[in-house]
C-alpha cells in the first residue's frame, strides 16, 4: 500500500510538472485528477492531499525559477544580462530592459484578486463543471489570439514590454484564477494580442508567475500547516522532485517550440479533454458523489 501511494505521488508530480506552465491549466488537471481519482482512493486523506498538491506545485515553480535564474538575478541587479535585440529594425531607439517594476505591475491584479477572493474561488470554482467551462473558454481565447497573430507582425521581445502591456497581461493572469482557464494560456494569448511574439509573451508569463506562485503556495502551506505530517515527508519529497525534473524538461521544450507550434494545438487538446471528461462525468457519473 505504501509503495502504491508513493507511485501515485510520483504520477501527480509528473502531471504537475507537465502542465503547470503549459497553456492547458495545471490547476484544472489537478482538480480533475482529484475529483475523478484521488478522492476515490483516499490518497493521503483529503486535507493532506491538498498540501501535497501545494508542495508539488512548488516543484514546478522552482523549475521555472531555475530556467530563468539569470533573468531574476539581472532583474534584482545581482547579475548581468544583455537585452534581446529589437527585431523592429529601428536602430535609433534605445533598447528597453525588463525590470522589477514590470514584474510587480504584472503581479498586482492577481495579487489583489487572490487576497480578496481566494477563499470564495476555492469554495465555488474548484469543481469539475467549472473547470470544464474554464478549459473551453480559455481554448477559444487561445484560438482567437493565434488567428490574430497571423494578421499582424509581432516584433517585440520580452525586453521591449512596456508597463501598460505588463499590467494588461497581469489582468489576464487574475482572470486565470478561474480553474481551468490556465494562467499561461491566458497571459500568453493576451501578450500575443498586444503584439508580443509567442516566445516573449511566454518568457514574461513565466517570470511574472514565479513570485506570485511562490507567495500563494507559501500562504497555502501556512494556512494548512496542521495537515503536514512527518509520515508524508517521503511523498512530498518524491512528488516535489518529480514535478521539478519534469517541469525543467517541459518548460525548456515549450519555450523552444512555442514560436513554431503556437497555441492552437494546446487549444485543440483542451477542447478534446473537455469533451472526454464531460462524457465521463455527465454521461457515466465518474467523479460525482465522491
UniProtKB/Swiss-Prot annotation:
Signal peptide: none annotated. It catalyses: di-trans,octa-cis-undecaprenyl diphosphate + H2O = di-trans,octa-cis-undecaprenyl phosphate + phosphate + H(+). It is a multi-pass membrane protein. Its EC number is 3.6.1.27. Keywords: Antibiotic resistance, Cell membrane, Cell shape, Cell wall biogenesis/degradation, Hydrolase, Membrane, Peptidoglycan synthesis, Transmembrane, Transmembrane helix. One of its GO terms (cellular component) is plasma membrane. GO terms for biological process: cell wall organization; peptidoglycan biosynthetic process; regulation of cell shape; response to antibiotic. Its main location: membrane. It is an enzyme of class 3 (hydrolase). Catalyzes the dephosphorylation of undecaprenyl diphosphate (UPP). Confers resistance to bacitracin. HAMAP family: Undec_diphosphatase. This is Undecaprenyl-diphosphatase. It comes from Staphylococcus epidermidis (strain ATCC 35984 / DSM 28319 / BCRC 17069 / CCUG 31568 / BM 3577 / RP62A). The gene is uppP.
